[in-house]
Amino acid sequence: MDYPKMDYFLDVESAHRLLDVESAQRFFYSQGAQARRATLLLPPTLMAASSEDDIDRRPIRRVRSKSDTPYLAEARISFNLGAAEEVERLAAMRSDSLVPGTHTPPIRRRSKFANLGRIFKPWKWRKKKSEKFKHTSAALERKISMRQSREELIKRGVLKEIYDKDGELSISNEEDSLENGQSLSSSQLSLPALSEMEPVPMPRDPCSYEVLQPSDIMDGPDPGAPVKLPCLPVKLSPPLPPKKVMICMPVGGPDLSLVSYTAQKSGQQGVAQHHHTVLPSQIQHQLQYGSHGQHLPSTTGSLPMHPSGCRMIDELNKTLAMTMQRLESSEQRVPCSTSYHSSGLHSGDGVTKAGPMGLPEIRQVPTVVIECDDNKENVPHESDYEDSSCLYTREEEEEEEDEDDDSSLYTSSLAMKVCRKDSLAIKLSNRPSKRELEEKNILPRQTDEERLELRQQIGTKLTRRLSQRPTAEELEQRNILKPRNEQEEQEEKREIKRRLTRKLSQRPTVEELRERKILIRFSDYVEVADAQDYDRRADKPWTRLTAADKAAIRKELNEFKSTEMEVHELSRHLTRFHRP
């Protein structure tokens, strides 16, 4: 017997293999008319088995019409599943009716947060972070390995280069940083041929002028040490380290270059001295005259200047000329006795020495490192006075005289206290003079002639304004100023006097006022009686009342209520004390 082939039915072999007769019947009953029509096309063995069984009396639930083809496709798909229970459950879930049958399992509803796992996946975040960290660290390592040298950065223009003659001078930029991240802040001046030489370290103190001595005229044991100029506690150092200006004046000519290195770390000294700003006039004075009074050849006038350093030296000369006279006066006012180091400047011309290993002859020139104090107003006066070298020299002298430690400590602490308390005098001594204010263009610089001209201009302005004021006649014409004679004024005064005397003569006496019950003073309103003085706060008169007193008060109050107080007729029944 040939069975018709229909694409929406399963083949018979798979139906035999997957289902027994009962489950197939159950499924086809649940699928409606189209599924029931499929039972006619089953093989005879299947039909016989189904006729022998009892007929299923369950009500048939019809869900869709005959034209609904997708359900046939769903039936075909569901036959491929493993068990008939799965088929039945799927059919119940596909149906629009949510009421489960007697044999259908309950519908499994999906959770509210079923879709949350698609969007929100926090278990992957840690992995992403660690991967990101690995990527960034790898990129940083790659950048560090690809870092360029100083010469390449100078070629690219990242670092500035001041001049290149025999030696190269280059100022390190902010971008040229150390390996640990700290940026180089000091200016560096280096020779490629003399890279092995030890640089001369300068103290870290930001407020000291230092003169580097010529290497050939040193007689002391410390040939490379800088000579510290004596200090004056007049200009106090700003709290932050200011900008440095290097004055380099090579002696031999343009082919000789200066080797100096400015390091930030100072040597470990016994006493950490903060030097005050050395005055520029003192620098000139100390360059010309040594510590022992011996005359040195003047360096600023005779030395030829390097072409690239001309601008800096011009600026320095301007500042020297600007502050010369004021600083000389302050020098006379506050003398300070300080001593040079053991290695002093000696007289004599600078002689060039041949360097080691056949290097070209190099002459060390006196180099002045000057700090530009841009912020003179924000000055910690007391702390600088505490650390001034004058106090330290006094303490050293006391120690040399072998005085008691306690007494020296007491005197030094007393001196510190006096210096601290004298801050007003320090501030007054640090006030800038008129000339300095004029030089800073804070006060306008004026000669006597300019001052006189300004006064004359102000005078002419005032006279012109006074001449523009209206005269008395104009004011009279405008009816602002009324014309008056002396006789008229006298008459007005007499009239006022007459009126006042008439009023005073017509004033009633106190008795008349009392008769009219017009009282003047407060005592006229109040009856005065003598009373005993007692503590009114502590006194509680109701505690002294007896039961009879209380009853009398109550009776009086009730009578007053019943007779004097008016009560509305509608609320009279609410009162206890109404008239009978």
UniProtKB/Swiss-Prot annotation:
Interacts (via RPEL repeats) with ACTA1 and PPP1CA; ACTA1 and PPP1CA compete for the same binding site. A motif (Nuclear localization signal) lies at residues 108-129. RPEL repeats lie at residues 138-163, 422-447, 460-484, 498-523. Induction: Up-regulated by VEGFA. Binds three actin monomers via the three C-terminal RPEL repeats. The modification Phosphothreonine is found at residue 104. Residues 335-345 have a biased composition (Polar residues). Binds actin monomers (G actin) and plays a role in multiple processes including the regulation of actin cytoskeleton dynamics, actin stress fibers formation, cell motility and survival, formation of tubules by endothelial cells, and regulation of PPP1CA activity. Involved in the regulation of cortical neuron migration and dendrite arborization. GO terms for biological process: actin cytoskeleton organization; actomyosin structure organization; cell motility; cerebral cortex development; dendrite arborization; regulation of neuron migration; stress fiber assembly. It comes from the Eukaryota. SMART domains: RPEL (SM00707). It is found in: Cytoplasm; Synapse; Nucleus. Residues 331-355, 376-410, 462-494 are annotated as: Disordered. Belongs to the phosphatase and actin regulator family. This is Phosphatase and actin regulator 1. The modification Phosphoserine is found at residues 67, 78, 467, 505. Residues 395-407 have a biased composition (Acidic residues).
